[in-house]
Amino acid sequence: TAVLTQTDYLLVYPIGTEAGALPVKYWLTDTNAKNLSIHIQPTSSVRVRAMITGSGATTSPFGVALYCRKDADSYTKAVDSFGANVFRLYGAGATPDIPSSLTPTSNRLCSASCVVGAMLRDQSSSFTVQALTIGQSIELDTVIYIIASPGVTVNCRYQKDDGTALNVYTNTATMIIDEPAAGGMGF
């Protein structure tokens, strides 16, 4: 039986090239910053990068999307508007410092048997993960915008586009909303 596992994640600043944007914990290397939760301001943008690995048997191709939740709520697909959520996709607007949707991903988390993934910024840019053979991995990178009150926790993970969860989540991205920084500058 084919098994899909989200094995690792990396939370990255939204600004910068696909491969060159710094981890939010910028003083750490990608390897040391992976799978670490972060504390962010009540209004923040962040890139959620994750690696999905196939095992057991060759997987079938599937559409993929980022799903997030506030605190213990159910996971909801991140779309271009907030609706009732505290998160949304960044959007497709012209932002020269953030790669556009479907920009191919490099290998920041994957060290072997990697297939090319994609950057996702808006809901109109769908991406289909090709069939993964046993041991193959893919990296996906999605830019989200969060507006939430201090004390809120936002978790994000990749699921199939139709809402079906992957088989296993070894690590799930976690962002904890803090009080605004002194001086109101966000630093």
What are these language model-derived features?
Residues 69-74, 82, 105-112, 157-169:
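Enriched for extracellular/lumenal, surface-exposed ectodomains of secreted and cell-surface proteins
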Residues 51-61, 126-181:
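Ser/Thr/Pro-rich, low-complexity mucin-like regions
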Residues 1-41, 122-123, 127, 176-187:
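Short, compositionally biased P/S/T/A/G/V-rich stretches that sit at domain boundaries
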Residues 9-13, 48, 66, 140-142, ...:
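Generic structural hydrophobic/aromatic packing signal, biased to beta-strands
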